[in-house]
Amino acid sequence: MIAAPLDAVADSKGKKPFYSHLYVQVLAAIAAGILLGHFYPELGTQLKPLGDAFIKLVKMVIAPVIFLTVATGIAGMSDLKKVGRVAGKAMLYFLTFSTLALVIGMIVANVVQPGAGMNIDPASLDPKAVATFADKAHEQSIVGFLTNIIPTTIVGAFADGDILQVLFFSVLFGIALAMVGEKGEQVVTFLNALTAPIFKLVGILMKAAPIGAFGAMAFTIGKYGIGSIANLAMLIGTFYITSLLFVLVVLGAVARYNGFSILALLRYIKEELLLVLGTSSSEAALPGLMNKMEKAGCKRSVVGLVIPTGYSFNLDGTNIYMTLAALFIAQATGIQLSWGDQILLLLVAMLSSKGAAGITGAGFITLAATLSVVPSVPVAGMALILGIDRFMSECRALTNLVGNAVATIVVARWENELDTGQLARALGGESEDTSTAGLQPAE
C-alpha cells in the first residue's frame, strides 16, 4: 500500500498543506499546461515527450499490479466457483450499461441534433484523413479479439503490456495456486510480500503525475488550439453534458441503490480523474484505481477481475460517443437515417465496441469500424471530428473510469465481498446520502 503522509509535511493540526495533495498539483499543472500551450504553442507541442514518458512509466507497472492483485485474490478464495460467478455478474453489468450508454447517445443525438444545419457535402470530405483509423478498424474482428486474449507466451503478455492477456494468465495462475493447496502457500506468501513494494513503486511514480499532465495538456492545446473547440462546440458540449448526466443520473441512481453516493465516490477518486484529464489516458489511472477500490472495502479478487476486464468491456463514455458521433456525421452531411438504420447502427456498435477494445485510440477506431459496416453514413465523415477527437477522448476516458469504479463496488456488493463500513469510511461520509442512509449490506 502507498505510504502514509510524512510528518514533515503535516501542519499543526496533523493535516497536509493543501499544495502537497497530488490532485492540487495535477490541477495546477493542467492549468499551467493550458496557458503555455495557448500562448506559446510551438513550445507546447515540444513538451509531448513529458506526457508520453509518464504514461510509459505507469504502463510499466500495470502488468505486475494486475498479476499480483488477481493471482493473490483468487488464490485466497475458498470457493473457486466464485471466479466464474464474479466474472459472469461483471459481464452482465457491463453488457447492460454499455448498451444503455449506446441508447442514450442515440436518443440525445435525435433530440439535440448537434449536426443539423451544417450542410456538409460528403464528396468534399477527405477520406485520406481517416484512412489509418479505417484500416485499423477493418483489421479488428470479434473472433480475432477473443483469440488474441490468449498470449503466445507468458513473457510476451507481460512484455507487451496487453491487459487482457495478463489478466487471462493471472486468473489461470491464481486458480492453479488455489488448487494445489498447501504446496502453493509459499508462493502466495511471496506474491503478497511483493505487492507492498509494487504499490510503493506506484506511489513513487505518481509523484511525476503533475509533470506528465503539464506536458500532455501543453501539447494538446499547442497543437490543436482552443479555437478548434469553437468550430464544433455544439457536438463537444452535447457530449460532455450527456456524459456528465450519465454519471450523475444513471450511475448516481445505481450508486444510491447500492448504498453509496456517486459524489462521494467522485471525491474519493479525484486524483485518478485529474490524472486522466491531464493525460487523456485512462490506463494512467488503472493502478491507483485498483488500489483505491481495495482500500474502499472491495475484496481483492473482485477488484482484480472487474477493473481490468472493465477497461475493455465497460466503456460507457466510448459508447455514448459512438452513437452520438455517428448520428452527428449523418446530420452534418444531410443524410436522413430511418429508425431501422439507427437500430442497425446500434447493433453493430454493440459488437464493434468489443472487437476493438484495448487498442490505442479505441474510441475513434470503433467508430470507424461501425460506420464501415453501416453503409448509410460515410466513413469519410469522420474527418469532421478528427480535429476535436483529442478533446472528446478526455471525456470518454473520465466517464469510462467512473463507470468501472461504480461497477467494481456493485459487483463486490452482489457477491457479499464488500466491507460497507470500510466503504463508508473511505468515501468520507461527507455527503448526505451516505451519512443519513448509511451503507446497507448486499441482499
UniProtKB/Swiss-Prot annotation:
<comment type="similarity">
    <text>Belongs to the dicarboxylate/amino acid:cation symporter (DAACS) (TC 2.A.23) family.</text>
</comment>
<keyword id="KW-0812">Transmembrane</keyword>
<dbReference type="GO" id="GO:0015141">
    <property type="term" value="F:succinate transmembrane transporter activity"/>
</dbReference>
<dbReference type="GO" id="GO:0070778">
    <property type="term" value="P:L-aspartate transmembrane transport"/>
</dbReference>
<feature type="transmembrane region" description="Helical">
    <location>
        <begin position="161"/>
        <end position="181"/>
    </location>
</feature>
<dbReference type="Pfam" id="PF00375">
    <property type="entry name" value="SDF"/>
</dbReference>
<dbReference type="GO" id="GO:0015366">
    <property type="term" value="F:malate:proton symporter activity"/>
</dbReference>
<keyword id="KW-0813">Transport</keyword>
<feature type="transmembrane region" description="Helical">
    <location>
        <begin position="92"/>
        <end position="112"/>
    </location>
</feature>
<dbReference type="InterPro" id="IPR023954">
    <property type="entry name" value="C4_dicarb_transport"/>
</dbReference>
<feature type="transmembrane region" description="Helical">
    <location>
        <begin position="17"/>
        <end position="37"/>
    </location>
</feature>
<dbReference type="GO" id="GO:0005886">
    <property type="term" value="C:plasma membrane"/>
</dbReference>
<dbReference type="InterPro" id="IPR018107">
    <property type="entry name" value="Na-dicarboxylate_symporter_CS"/>
</dbReference>
<keyword id="KW-0769">Symport</keyword>
<dbReference type="InterPro" id="IPR036458">
    <property type="entry name" value="Na:dicarbo_symporter_sf"/>
</dbReference>
<keyword id="KW-0997">Cell inner membrane</keyword>
<feature type="transmembrane region" description="Helical">
    <location>
        <begin position="320"/>
        <end position="340"/>
    </location>
</feature>
<feature type="transmembrane region" description="Helical">
    <location>
        <begin position="201"/>
        <end position="221"/>
    </location>
</feature>
<protein>
    <recommendedName>
        <fullName>C4-dicarboxylate transport protein</fullName>
    </recommendedName>
</protein>
<dbReference type="InterPro" id="IPR001991">
    <property type="entry name" value="Na-dicarboxylate_symporter"/>
</dbReference>
<keyword id="KW-1133">Transmembrane helix</keyword>
<keyword id="KW-1003">Cell membrane</keyword>
<keyword id="KW-0472">Membrane</keyword>
<feature type="transmembrane region" description="Helical">
    <location>
        <begin position="234"/>
        <end position="254"/>
    </location>
</feature>
<dbReference type="GO" id="GO:0015138">
    <property type="term" value="F:fumarate transmembrane transporter activity"/>
</dbReference>
<comment type="function">
    <text>Responsible for the transport of dicarboxylates such as succinate, fumarate, and malate from the periplasm across the membrane.</text>
</comment>
<feature type="transmembrane region" description="Helical">
    <location>
        <begin position="139"/>
        <end position="159"/>
    </location>
</feature>
<feature type="transmembrane region" description="Helical">
    <location>
        <begin position="57"/>
        <end position="77"/>
    </location>
</feature>
<feature type="transmembrane region" description="Helical">
    <location>
        <begin position="368"/>
        <end position="388"/>
    </location>
</feature>
